[in-house]
Amino acid sequence: SAASDVYKRQDYSKLLNNKAKKKTLVSLYDPQTKERWEEVVLPISNGELNNLLYTRWVKQRAADVDKWSNGRLGYVHIQSMGDPSFRSVYSDILGKYNDREGIVIDTRFNGGGRLHEDIEILFSGEKYLTQVTRGREACDMPSRRWNKPSIMLQCEANYSNAHGTPWVYKHQQIGRLVGMPVPGTMTTVSWETLQDPTLVFGTPITGYRLSDGSYLENTQLEPDVKVANSPETVVKGEDTQLRTAVQELLKEIDKK
């Protein structure tokens, strides 16, 4: 295609529209050195950009937890209640965080799926054996579950199974919840694509009933420690909810 000039104060991003995954020649100019040179770039899609932003966000949270806890706690974010997220969490807590004293489980902004039973089992381990080889302790058992303390973060943007999973976590007394209340949206939804494939209907078809006859749907889940992230702190890159979760879990561990 023909070359396009970029003028002062012009938003050049629109020149990269519809060029994702297409090698694009860019000419750059440094007004101070008066040097001009060319680079070949590979534009990415909005979806890829969002994935990179998400990965950066998770790495920032993990680094903060590591710093605030002096390396005592690990951090995992459950992006969605599905298999890929579970595998990531499983790998992290039993891999790089295996020797940590506790785990901060972040479910904020999770749109749901079905993972409440898996998370319940994974984080409710209780040590019953220690493997010893020639006098050296090798590992605790169960070795495929988390046997140490944890705490869970939730927020107003949690939806569906991201309401149900924190509810199960609290109901089974695995740990405490930190953050903001979650609307009662724990249902099973049937997703139906219409003749026009751009139209998709999600119809709640299954409710989750407690022994007293009430349903999780429309039952707001309150955190044990209520704390909001204000816009004033978010724009500074500060995560008040996360810092509170770290402080609360460390206090719990130090009591033992």
Each language-model region and where it sits:
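Metal-dependent DNA phosphodiester-chemistry modules and their immediately adjacent helices/loops
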Residues: A63, N158-S160, Q195-K226
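Glycine-rich active-site/cofactor-binding loop and its immediate structural neighborhood
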Residues: S1
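Short acidic (Asp/Glu) and glycine-rich catalytic loops that position anionic groups and cofactors
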Residues: Y97-E101, L221-A228
